[in-house]
Each structure stands twice: as structure tokens, then as C-alpha cells.
From Swiss-Prot:
Function, as annotated: Lignin degradation and detoxification of lignin-derived products.
Binding site for Cu cation 1: 86, 483
Residue span(s) of domain Plastocyanin-like: 36-152, 162-316, 429-563
Protein's name in the database: Laccase-4
GO biological process entries: lignin catabolic process
Location in the cell: Secreted, Extracellular space, Apoplast
Coiled-coil annotated residue ranges, if any: none
Binding positions for Cu cation 3 per the UniProt entry: 133, 485, 542
Cellular component, GO annotation: apoplast
UniProt-annotated glycosylation sites, renumbered to this chain: 41, 82, 118, 191, 207, 243, 304, 340, 347, 386, 393, 403, 439, 446, 462
């Protein structure tokens, strides 16, 4: 009897192994990646150029981790440009040194040098992405960052048959560094891209690109999760798959209440996970997966073309060795909204709601310690002496928040703060509201000039913040996708016209607002967000339209250390790059 009982019990070794597995599942593992920044040749639109890449790829390598994992990426710079990489949407709690924006949290990695980005993905799961965060190098230096749920934790929706990253980008035949440098030197707008891309490929609607087409092969009746990422530099995009619906289940790595659409909109910096269920039968046709710009800007300042991939079905009647693409099949195209269809965009964004369940609560700050009001928009700077500028009335194009056009410092802000050597680097006096209020969405003022400076807004640790961002009509109303580093925030309200501080707060959603890291400030309108400043460090906030960021539509928050050890910024790593 004793022998029978003992043989039925697990051995001490098996118990120890099981316990270790449980600990690993709870705490995560460490995942190591090597990123070599190098030049590589690529041919698109019958044009070959040498461009900056990671590991010779564009898009770059897909990073995969699980919630709770530590991610260690060694980045070695083998190109003539300085480089820095940002892990877009990763909270970086107390690890701001790994956030990546050049001259904000680090000096860039110089030619021949390396830097190790070391961070833990805590309390996050879903689709994020990574990209270069200096000049316009993210045009070719970007990739997916997929955070899977912890082992044993299911999705809050039926598990898909397959998951597929779909990354939207832009292609310039020219060198993008020359494009931005020319714009800065002339004071005008940059030349628009020559094509949009899906996973680096322009697709059949562009000249010389039929062979450079992304194709997604599906099985009848199966459900696929598309991890959509807008890595385009300057364009918000509509996306649809002909004759198919898309069920939105996540944005910016946060689950949402599922809803089904024919078409969606996604801004630069944003991610959206959608479920696509293939037809239950072989349809005998192929279907375009198309994206085209949503723009409220003046004509000529954006690329108005369409990128397409192809959704094709496996034919059960064909052998697996048969050609994957059957020529001669009907090819259906989706109908996308008009390029300036703001009503469509508003209706789509209004559908976004957090799950707000016990498993995935919406921790919206119910009380507010600090309220801020930022104007967001374009403007001008005087043309330097002995120059002719291409901005309005011989000015330089500029952009600002609260009329401050942000100037990048020569020394990283986070390092300056941490060492206490901030004098001459930045001023902690970013205006909490416009210094000269005006009719923000009415007749533009005659004076379109902005001020310049490197100003930070200082917050005590754990401050609950409410921020209203107001678009302005200076040089024309325009949608601005604003990205906040270091935090997620809740989008509690939005509207058109001038924000009404008396009546609009009554309409705020404090129950299940969508939680994200990048939000569009509506053209000619406003958006209100709330977040808890529980992450010490210096955190960049900027428009994710790269042209606007270059013109100065950016600022930074400085969140001070809390009183407890786990509320303080960790010291910098020993290999932190020097300026």
C-alpha cells in the first residue's frame, strides 16, 4: 500500500520543475535580440536606392514577447547617421533610458557605437511597434512589437486561426533625409511620398509594382487576426478589405468592446487589431485589401494614392503544390471614404470603448489634480535674413503647442534632469494654457508667428491629469495624431469648434472610454484625455505626422520621483550614449 501511494505521488524533482514553470510563467523570461543598423539596397517602383535598415530588412524584425517578459535589444549603428530607437507604446515604467527619442531620453547612438535597450513589458499585451526616433529615419527603420498574453491567459474573444502583422508605410524614391533637409532649408513643406506600402510592398495599383504585392492566403471559414500598424510618416489612412467585414477588438495594445465595420481609420503611431472571418466557401475570386489617406490638409501637402494587398482563398479542389495565385479570377475592390471624410472618422472613433470588465478594468481617474489646455496647430517663423522661404508670405513653416515651437536640445533632457544640470538645456515653464487666447477655430489671426523654446511641464508623482487639446485654424484646420510617451491615457471626450470648459465636461465618458497612447485631435475640434502621472522621467508628447514634429509640434512632461523607492527613476545604464 505504501509503495502504491508513493508511486502515485509526484517526485520532488517533478514538483520542483512544476514550481519553476509556474514562477517563469508569472515573472516572464528574458528575450534577447540583436539589431544591426545597416545600409541595404531596395527596389520599388522600378527605382533602386540604398537606405537605412535594421538587419537589412524593411520592415525590420518582428519582436515577440509575452506580458511580463524582459526584452533586451542590442543596437549597433553601422551607418553614417546617428540613430535611436523607440518602442512605441511600451510604458517603460522607471526605465525611461530605454524609451528612445533622440535628445529627449538619450543622446543618439553614434556611428560604430552600440546601446542596449533593456525593459520589461509589464501589464501590457497586444500590438505595439518600434521605430527610429531621430529625423525621418523611421521611414525605413520600423517593425512590429507583438506582446502575447501570459501563458494560459486567453484572448477575450475567440482565438483566431492565424495572426498576421499588416504594417502600413510610405516609400520615397528619394532619400528621406534629403527630403526633410530640403524642407527645413527652404522653410516649406516636404515633398510627398511616391507610394504607400503594406509590409514594405506598394502593390499592383502603382506602376512597376505588380510583383511587389502583399498577399494574404486564407482558408474558407477560418478567422484571422490582422495586427494593423500605421507606420506611415505623414498620413492617416482608411483601410478596408473588399466584400469582407472587420471586427475591431483592440487598439494601441488595449482590448476594446468588439464592433464590426466595413472600413476603419488608423493614424500614424496607432495600432488596431481586427478579426477577419473568411467566407465559409471558396468564392472563386480575390479581394483587394486597400488603404488610402484621410487628410484635412490643403491639397498638394499629402499623397493621394491607394495601396493594395490581395486576399486570396485556398481552393480545396486544388493540390497544395498548385500556384498560390490563380490568374483570371475576378478581383474585387473596396469602396473607401472620401479623403476628407471627417464625419466617417468621428463615427468610427465614437465606437471605441474599453472593455471595462473585472479582468480588464478601465482605471479612469475620477478626480483631477491638474487641468491643462493646449492649442495644437501650425504657424510660421520669420524667414532668416538673406533667404527666400517657401512658407506663406516668405515665412518658414512651423508648428506649436500653446504657441511654443519645441526646439530639440543639444543634450538629452532626461540626463540633464537626472544629473541636476538642466541650466541652459531646458526651462521648466511650459505654459499650462495659451498665453493669448483667441477664437481658435474661427477666422485665423493676422499674426501667425510662433515662439520657440525647449520647455517642459513639471508634474508631481501620481498627479491625475486632464488635458484638453484644441486644434487651431491658423494656416487651416487639420487633424493631428498626438502620441504620449511613457503612459496610456483615456479619451474621455471630443468635439468640434472651440472647447467649452463650462458645458463640454458634462459629456465626458468616465465609465468606459477607450484607452490608448496616440489620439487624433479632430480637425477644427478638440479632444480631452486623462492619465495618471505614475511614471517618473521625461516623457515626449508630439504629433505623429513627421512633418509637423519637424516643425516643432512637440513638448515634454517631467514627472518627478515619488517618495518610495519603487516610485523613482532607475539610474542610467553604463552604456548610455553620449552627445
Amino acid at each position: 500500500m505504501t509503495m502504491a501511494i508513493s508511486s502515485a505521488l509526484p517526485s520532488p524533482l517533478l514538483l520542483a520543475a512544476s514550481l519553476l514553470l509556474l514562477i517563469v510563467q508569472a515573472q516572464g523570461i528574458t528575450r534577447h535580440y540583436e539589431f544591426n543598423v545597416q545600409m541595404a539596397n531596395a527596389t520599388r517602383l522600378c527605382n533602386t536606392k540604398s537606405m537605412v535598415t535594421v538587419n537589412g530588412q524593411c520592415p525590420g524584425p518582428e519582436l515577440v514577447a509575452r506580458e511580463g517578459d524582459r526584452v533586451v535589444i542590442r543596437v549597433t549603428n553601422n551607418v553614417a547617421h546617428n540613430i535611436s530607437l523607440h518602442w512605441h507604446g511600451v510604458r517603460q515604467v522607471r526605465t525611461g533610458w530605454a524609451d528612445g527619442p533622440a535628445y529627449i531620453t538619450q543622446c543618439p547612438i553614434q556611428t560604430g557605437q552600440s546601446y542596449v535597450y533593456n525593459f520589461t513589458v509589464a501589464g501590457q499585451r497586444g500590438t505595439l511597434w518600434w521605430h527610429a526616433h531621430i529625423s525621418w529615419l523611421r521611414a525605413t527603420v520600423y517593425g512590429a512589437l507583438v506582446i502575447l498574453p501570459k501563458l494560459g491567459v486567453p484572448y477575450p474573444f475567440p482565438a483566431p486561426h492565424k495572426e498576421v502583422p499588416v504594417i502600413f508605410g510610405e516609400w520615397w524614391n528619394a532619400d528621406t533625409e534629403e527630403v526633410v533637409n530640403q524642407a527645413v532649408q527652404t522653410g516649406g513643406g516636404p515633398n510627398v511620398s511616391d507610394a504607400f506600402t503594406i509590409n514594405g510592398l506598394p502593390g499592383p495599383l502603382y506602376n512597376c509594382s505588380a510583383q511587389d504585392t502583399f498577399k494574404l492566403k486564407v482558408k474558407p471559414g477560418k478567422t484571422y487576426m490582422l495586427r494593423l500598424i500605421n507606420a506611415a510618416l505623414n498620413e492617416e489612412l482608411f483601410f478596408a478589405v473588399a466584400n469582407h467585414t472587420l471586427t475591431v477588438v483592440e487598439v494601441d495594445a488595449v482590448y476594446v468592446k468588439p464592433f464590426t465595420v466595413d472600413t476603419l481609420v488608423i493614424s500614424p503611431g496607432q495600432t488596431t487589431n481586427v478579426l477577419l472571418t473568411a467566407k465559409p466557401y471558396y468564392p472563386g475570386a480575390n479581394f483587394y485589401m486597400s488603404a488610402a489617406p484621410y487628410s484635412t490638409a490643403r491639397p498638394g501637402t499629402f499623397g493621394n494614392t491607394t495601396v493594395a494587398g490581395i486576399l486570396e482563398y485556398e481552393n480545396p479542389a486544388m493540390s497544395p503544390s498548385a500556384a498560390s495565385f490563380v490568374k483570371g479570377l475576378p478581383l474585387f475592390k473596396p469602396t473607401l471614404p472620401q479623403l476628407n471624410d471627417t464625419d466617417f472618422v468621428t463615427n468610427f472613433t465614437d465606437k471605441l470603448r474599453s472593455l471595462a470588465t473585472p479582468e480588464y478594468p478601465a482605471a479612469v481617474p475620477q478626480s483631477v489634480d491638474k487641468r491643462f489646455f493646449f492649442t495644437v496647430g501650425l504657424g510660421t517663423l520669420p524667414c532668416p535674413a538673406n533667404m527666400t522661404c517657401q512658407g506663406p508670405n516668405n515665412t518658414q513653416m512651423a508648428a506649436s503647442m500653446n504657441n511654443v515651437s519645441f526646439v530639440l536640445p543639444a543634450r538629452a533632457l532626461l540626463q540633464s534632469h537626472f544629473t541636476g544640470l538642466s541650466s541652459g538645456v531646458y526651462a521648466p515653464d511650459f505654459p499650462v494654457a495659451p498665453l493669448s487666447p483667441f477664437n481658435y477655430t474661427g477666422t485665423p489671426p493676422n499674426n501667425t508667428n510662433v515662439k520657440t523654446g525647449t520647455k517642459l511641464l513639471v508634474l508631481r508623482y501620481n498627479t491625475s491629469v486632464e488635458l484638453v487639446m484644441q486644434d487651431t485654424s491658423i494656416l487651416g484646420i487639420e487633424s493631428h495624431p498626438l502620441h504620449l510617451h511613457g503612459f496610456n491615457f483615456f479619451v474621455i471626450g471630443q468635439g468640434f469648434g472651440n472647447y467649452d470648459a463650462v458645458n463640454d465636461p458634462a459629456k465626458f465618458n468616465l465609465v468606459d472610454p477607450v484607452e490608448r497612447n496616440t489620439v487624433g485631435v479632430p480637425a477644427g475640434g478638440w479632444v480631452a484625455i486623462r492619465f495618471l502621472a505614475d511614471n517618473p522621467g521625461v516623457w515626449f508628447m508630439h504629433c505623429h505626422l513627421e512633418a509637423h514634429t519637424t516643425w516643432g509640434l512637440r513638448m515634454a512632461w517631467l514627472v518627478l520621483d515619488g517618495s518610495h523607492p519603487n516610485q523613482k527613476l532607475l539610474p542610467p545604464p553604463s552604456d548610455l550614449p553620449k552627445c
